[in-house]
Amino acid sequence: MSGQPKRLMVMAGGTGGHVFPGLAVAHHLMDQGWQVRWLGTADRMEADLVPKHGIEIDFIRISGLRGKGVKALLAAPLRIFNAWRQARAIMKQFKPDVVLGMGGYVSGPGGLAAWSLGIPVVLHEQNGIAGLTNKWLAKIATTVMQAFPGAFPKADVVGNPVRTDVLALPLPQERLAGREGPIRVLVVGGSQGARVLNQTLPQVAAKLGDTVTIWHQSGKGAQQTVEQAYAGAGQPQHKVTEFIDDMAAAYAWADVVVCRSGALTVSEIAAAGLPALFVPFQHKDRQQYWNALPLEKAGAAKIFEQPQFTVDAVASTLSGWSRETLLTMAERARAASIPDATERVANEVSRAARA
């Protein structure tokens, strides 16, 4: 039996913030000879994405409970029980040595199923505030890790696994020193875009004129509207794209990023070594604010809560950052990153499997 490869089941779903870090760890361990399967849901992004990475995926039926009506909440215990039973059957067949919970609804019943079978449960929390599922699973987990300090009182801070092409970018000093011309502003609202960025940045561009050049990811279906907004502001020269497929190339081009502060975005910007102006999504637990705070504290970023994200405030901030200031901020961002996060998570998975 000692010659058999170790088996890992990754539990992650719903959003890229959960799925992409899980894929990074999965590939790292597969390169070491591990056999990996995935536990997800059939109606979320992992259903299409994970098989494209050469990983087999099993599905359970589960969805979130937040914002659901009374009827759905009353049915929740039965739904969770059924999902637990499905996950347990899948694990009894695959027999993983360890499971890795990266977040999403699937982690709850999946983690419980593993625990009930005596399989070690390793958790990774990507956000600065722990999600409901991970808070609950932390009580039964073998190992708990966090990307940012503060999500759990005693968990190791290991960072977020990020894409290798971002990690491979030249360091800020190499990349940014000697740059001249307009400040290059990369605007990223996530794949769905961010209306506040789409509405505000064209007006900011009008105030800043030829001191900046902007590359703006508008999000799905918004490209034409945003292009018209720039043209209407007398700034048609700026580049607007619906999606940016090669984010590493975009980071390499940029001097500064204006964006939301999802966990993966913050970690990628730190790893790339870029200054940022963060506009956290307004959520009741302020998750994105807490994600961005370590970089603001490090002097690598500025946070604008959405009500403060005005044309004048943004234009004033961007115009106040010289190239020297931006280089200093970029170096601070890189210094605050944890570039070996993938290895750290993978090492904890290996340790739990051997225990």
UniProtKB/Swiss-Prot annotation:
Keywords: Cell cycle, Cell division, Cell inner membrane, Cell membrane, Cell shape, Cell wall biogenesis/degradation, Glycosyltransferase, Membrane, Peptidoglycan synthesis, Transferase. Its main location: membrane. It catalyses: di-trans,octa-cis-undecaprenyl diphospho-N-acetyl-alpha-D-muramoyl-L-alanyl-D-glutamyl-meso-2,6-diaminopimeloyl-D-alanyl-D-alanine + UDP-N-acetyl-alpha-D-glucosamine = di-trans,octa-cis-undecaprenyl diphospho-[N-acetyl-alpha-D-glucosaminyl-(1->4)]-N-acetyl-alpha-D-muramoyl-L-alanyl-D-glutamyl-meso-2,6-diaminopimeloyl-D-alanyl-D-alanine + UDP + H(+). UDP-N-acetyl-alpha-D-glucosamine binds at T15, G16, G17, N127, R163, S191, I244, A263, L264, T265, V266, S267, E268, Q288. The keyword Iron does not apply. It is an enzyme of class 2 (transferase). It comes from the Bacteria. It is a peripheral membrane protein. Pathway: Cell wall biogenesis; peptidoglycan biosynthesis. Belongs to the glycosyltransferase 28 family. MurG subfamily. This is UDP-N-acetylglucosamine--N-acetylmuramyl-(pentapeptide) pyrophosphoryl-undecaprenol N-acetylglucosamine transferase.
